From Swiss-Prot:
InterPro entries per the UniProt record, alphabetical: ICAT_dom, ICAT_sf, LZIC
Pfam families, sorted: ICAT (PF06384)
TM stretches of this protein: none
Protein's recorded name: Protein LZIC
Record flagged with keyword Coiled coil: yes
Native organism: Dictyostelium discoideum
Gene Ontology molecular function, alphabetical: beta-catenin binding
UniProt keyword list: Coiled coil
Coiled-coil intervals: 6-65
Homology family: Belongs to the CTNNBIP1 family.
Length: 192
């Protein structure tokens, strides 16, 4: 009987991760098609997607308030949604890797953008922005950064990234109240 509850929890977790991946893929598609659509279409589509993420977050809140065993498992998904809604991370791929806690892929992405800036494929500003996102994600997931990476992050992190770090630090404490209050403040700020 106990395994049945665990099986249902695992199925729910898979469904939640699939929904998050769908929304993140949608965000990534919007960014990739930005040049091919009008600014109005871009803004409207992005707004709709962020609204869907807010609705998804509300559903997660309801689930977490009813089942405390899901709180820790859903915390990472909640944090990824907060990052997207608050727009602390601009790169959907980074949000996706962050939600999956995929250190290797984040490190690979960091190496790729370092190579791309040296080859002139991306601008220095894009390199800095994406590097900060990746390093902040790695740090938030408690992966060790080199002293050089720490210094780079401190030098370049934006106010929105600082806010995200401050708010998301509550998630690590694992309490339902902190998760819910953090989510509420992020949604309130994103709505402004």
């Amino acid at each position: 009987m106990a395994s049945r509850g665990k099986t249902e929890t695992n199925k729910l977790k898979v469904n939640i991760e699939e929904q998050l991946n769908r929304l993140l893929a949608q965000l990534q598609d919007i960014e990739e098609l930005k040049e091919d659509i009008t600014q109005e279409e871009y803004d409207e589509t992005k707004k709709d997607t962020l609204e869907q993420m807010k609705e998804f977050e509300q559903s997660l809140k309801k689930m977490m308030s009813g089942d405390m065993t899901l709180v820790s498992e859903l915390g990472g998904v909640q944090l990824a949604i907060q990052a997207a809604v608050s727009q602390a991370f601009k790169t959907p791929e980074v949000i996706k890797l962050f939600a999956k806690k995929d250190q290797n892929s984040l490190r690979t992405k960091l190496g790729n953008i370092q190579r791309d800036v040296q080859l002139g494929k991306i601008s220095k500003d894009a390199y800095i922005d994406q590097s900060v996102e990746i390093l902040a994600a790695l740090k938030k997931l408690d992966f060790v950064l080199s002293p050089e990476e720490e210094a780079f992050l401190e030098k370049h992190k934006s106010r929105s990234m600082s806010e995200f770090e401050k708010v998301s630090s509550n998630i690590g404490q694992g309490t339902k109240e902190n998760i819910l209050s953090s989510a509420a403040s992020q949604i309130k700020n994103a709505s402004k």
